[in-house]
């Protein structure tokens, strides 16, 4: 039996029935267009074998479409009113599908593996605009079991996530997300499919985790790569030689490390790919001892099973 999806009128009536008003502080804008949620689910390529982690399910539009695909769904909702209502809404629109749904009232930025009994294989979500990037990076780090990501974010954020090195939109999020996998855009979404209507367009982004990571995935290695990315984009128009001078100890030392990594010291940080950042760290570890935070333990760069996030 096909699940009955939510429409615009029903979304409003449902909100009114529980005396709910969307909160800007939670970035609450709910999709009410059935074609849009079907498009998101189709682009995610999930099936009955998947366990989907959904962030911010809200009133349940996307949740219903995910369940309609036959997948298990764990929906993480920060708003207790919406978290309490969601199982009732799902039960009213389907039959046994509610048995494949778990709802957790949690803050996604502090959500961790111990909050779940079964690890997710996919992340599909309409991410709140105000926490989209930190939430995405946190979940990719915390749940290496997630192989596929399909998220709807603010159009500007989507452009940044999918931007290539050297482009005007390329920045910290672009580089960091590629530490985990390949990124691509899946088009735009009009503000008119939301309630309340946001002032900006949204964009769909898909991330496919590398089948075999090209580099170590332990938390300490990731932290040091991310620190290099932050340094490079703190003053993105500087040459790499000057941008990394403080990190390396001097301009000359910076140039030596860059050359050891086959990077032209005159290149700007905004042109460096994730491969460049990783290679710079790895070559620097051979060339000299890489500075680490005082709290960091001895590097274990080969521990690819470590799963504690350090963002």
From Swiss-Prot:
PANTHER family referenced in this protein's UniProt entry, alphabetically: DIMETHYLADENOSINE TRANSFERASE, DIMETHYLADENOSINE TRANSFERASE-RELATED
Entry coiled-coil feature ranges: none
Disulfide bond annotation, renumbered to this chain: none
PROSITE patterns in UniProt: RRNA_A_DIMETH, SAM_RNA_A_N6_MT
InterPro entries xrefs: KsgA/Erm, rRNA_Ade_diMease-like_C, rRNA_Ade_Mease_Trfase_CS, rRNA_Ade_methylase_Trfase_N, rRNA_adenine_dimethylase, SAM-dependent_MTases_sf
Reactions the enzyme catalyzes: adenosine(1518)/adenosine(1519) in 16S rRNA + 4 S-adenosyl-L-methionine = N(6)-dimethyladenosine(1518)/N(6)-dimethyladenosine(1519) in 16S rRNA + 4 S-adenosyl-L-homocysteine + 4 H(+)
Name the record gives this protein: Ribosomal RNA small subunit methyltransferase A
Compartment(s): Cytoplasm
Superkingdom of origin: Bacteria
Positions of S-adenosyl-L-methionine binding: 29, 31, 56, 77, 107, 126
Functional summary from the UniProt entry: Specifically dimethylates two adjacent adenosines (A1518 and A1519) in the loop of a conserved hairpin near the 3'-end of 16S rRNA in the 30S particle. May play a critical role in biogenesis of 30S subunits.
Single GO cellular component term: cytosol
GO MF, any single term: RNA binding
Enzyme class: transferase
Family of this protein: Belongs to the class I-like SAM-binding methyltransferase superfamily. rRNA adenine N(6)-methyltransferase family. RsmA subfamily.
Main localisation: cytoplasm
EC number: 2.1.1.182
